[in-house]
Amino acid sequence: MRSAQVYRWQIPMDAGVVLRDRRLKTRDGLYVCLCDGEREGWGEISPLPGFSQETWEEAQTALLTWVNDWLQGNEGLPEMPSVAFGASCALAELTGVLPEAADYRAAPLCTGDPDDLVLRLADMPGEKIAKVKVGLYEAVRDGMVVNLLLEAIPDLHLRLDANRAWTPLKAQQFAKYVNPDYRARIAFLEEPCKTRDDSRAFARETGIAIAWDESLREADFTFEAEEGVKAVVIKPTLTGSLDKVREQVAAAHALGLTVVISSSIESSLGLTQLARIAAWLTPGTLPGLDTLHLMQAQQVRPWPGSALPCLKRDELERLL
């Protein structure tokens, strides 16, 4: 016998979280819990403002429609990426397709003070990998910060993310301030320029490896082996169903590319599922999931080791 619940939630964010020039004061989303007999499966639907095509309200309408169809025996999935991902995760838990094993390691995210990152990395066992957002300040400053980190920690590898913020000139200004001897320790730089051609040229001219992120969600994107392209970053909330995520991972791995499963600032429930997906589909590659510290609470499923309070399901607003 099938049954389902849908919950709506809102989590206050720490001050200072800015996405594409807009301050994110709260993280808004939905959970779906599907039940079939004794089995249960959860999924998170949380479109990311400024990145997702759909709004929270549109996702809610699509989710409620899909859940009612599922209760009637329909096995299809919705089209909206965030809804398709959350619904497919709930189904994958329900049917046992999504393994329980998880990779709770996370590449620490440096959002401000480089000294803070140095302290966090000092306690990190094994390979030291961190992520730095670039493109928010002057390109010269970004280059100096990256150079400082690579100089201060000789075994550090950095993943950088520019979110297409730079013109070719700005990108070159950044590279100018990174010692050529350190550039090989930039694991990759996600989407440095506004166009793929400019990003490719940047990789050729600087020797800094790049990764595709936003490009994966563009209609004309195809997986190809390209000079200077080392990785792809997959954000499942923005991608779609779990099957689509698996297809993209397989296509990238077939070309020898590194695949990083990355957060779209999901709640703790969604992050724990991404940790399981990373362990399943990209074993051995550190996922990019260090975003929980941007929030003021966890929900339903806590992240191991987090001191944030965790709300239980009966504390959430139930829609169905």
Curated annotation (Swiss-Prot):
Name of the protein in its database record: o-succinylbenzoate synthase
Catalytic residues of the enzyme: 133 (proton donor), 235 (proton acceptor)
One record GO biological process: menaquinone biosynthetic process
Record: residues binding Mg(2+): 161, 190, 213
Catalysis: reaction(s): (1R,6R)-6-hydroxy-2-succinyl-cyclohexa-2,4-diene-1-carboxylate = 2-succinylbenzoate + H2O
Keyword Metal-binding annotated: yes
Family: Belongs to the mandelate racemase/muconate lactonizing enzyme family. MenC type 1 subfamily.
Highest taxon above the source species: Bacteria
Pathway(s) this gene product operates in, as recorded in its UniProt entry: Quinol/quinone metabolism; 1,4-dihydroxy-2-naphthoate biosynthesis; 1,4-dihydroxy-2-naphthoate from chorismate: step 4/7; Quinol/quinone metabolism; menaquinone biosynthesis
Any one GO molecular function term: O-succinylbenzoate synthase activity
Pfam families found in the cross-reference section: MenC_N (PF21508), MR_MLE_C (PF13378)
Role this protein plays: Converts 2-succinyl-6-hydroxy-2,4-cyclohexadiene-1-carboxylate (SHCHC) to 2-succinylbenzoate (OSB).
Enzyme Commission no: 4.2.1.113
Cofactor: a divalent metal cation
Database matches in InterPro entries: Enolase-like_C_sf, Enolase-like_N, Enolase_C-like, Mandelate_racemase_C, OSB_synthase_MenC1, OSBS_N
Keywords: Lyase, Magnesium, Menaquinone biosynthesis, Metal-binding
